[in-house]
Design a protein with these regions (language model features):
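Acidic, surface-exposed loops and disordered segments
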Residues: 1-185
């Protein structure tokens, strides 16, 4: 898949959980590196202020978002609590205007998908390496993806960015657009 035209799976990259999760430092290396960097401006990092100011935005400025801010948003997703610390989710970053337009249509013509940064959070129960029935693993994966998305939205707010949660979409169409068999959450 050409990354210029299609979505790019950006998390996890090069990290696969093991049966036993003994080395938490492996997961935290990316986060630690990102936290060392700083965007051109930090807006607010007081958690309660961030939570109280976060709102759904339905109109976005057509401005490029700094890569370091996107990295911090993705790193925030990685800090969300997950079942067994296995991160049962994957994130797709949709950059292409054509793919964004297709997502608008897959999301019942909600125009908010034209935001400068579009992240699609998908559940991946195969990453949850627990000896439990499949329906429980699927439940854990959707919880993991949902928490990761929520943490990402809080990080975006802390960095002075707006966001919106889009929950009404055609799963099959979104899966085809981002070229995955994983179900978006």
């Amino acid at each position: 898949m050409d990354s210029k035209d299609g979505p790019e799976k950006i998390y996890p990259s090069g990290y696969e959980p093991k049966e036993t999760n003994t080395d938490v430092n492996v997961r935290n290396q990316l986060l630690n590196e990102i936290l060392k960097s700083s965007p051109t401006e930090f807006i607010n990092t007081d958690l309660f202020t961030v939570m109280s100011k976060r709102r759904s935005t339905r109109k976005f400025a057509d401005k490029i978002v700094e890569t370091v801010k996107i990295d911090k948003i993705i790193a925030a997703a990685d800090t969300a609590p997950t079942a067994g610390n296995f991160q049962g989710f994957e994130i797709f970053y949709v950059k292409s205007p054509e793919k964004k337009q297709q997502l608008v249509e897959a999301c019942n013509n909600q125009p908010y998908v034209h935001a400068p940064v579009v992240l699609v959070f998908c559940k991946n129960p195969a990453r949850v390496k627990l000896d439990l029935p499949e329906e429980i693993l699927k439940k854990f994966a959707i919880q993991d993806a949902t928490l990761a998305a929520a943490y990402s939205q809080l990080a975006a707010q802390a960095l002075g960015l707006s966001s919106i949660w889009i929950g009404m979409f055609d799963e099959q169409k979104v899966m085809k657009i981002i070229n995955t068999d994983l179900i978006p959450s």
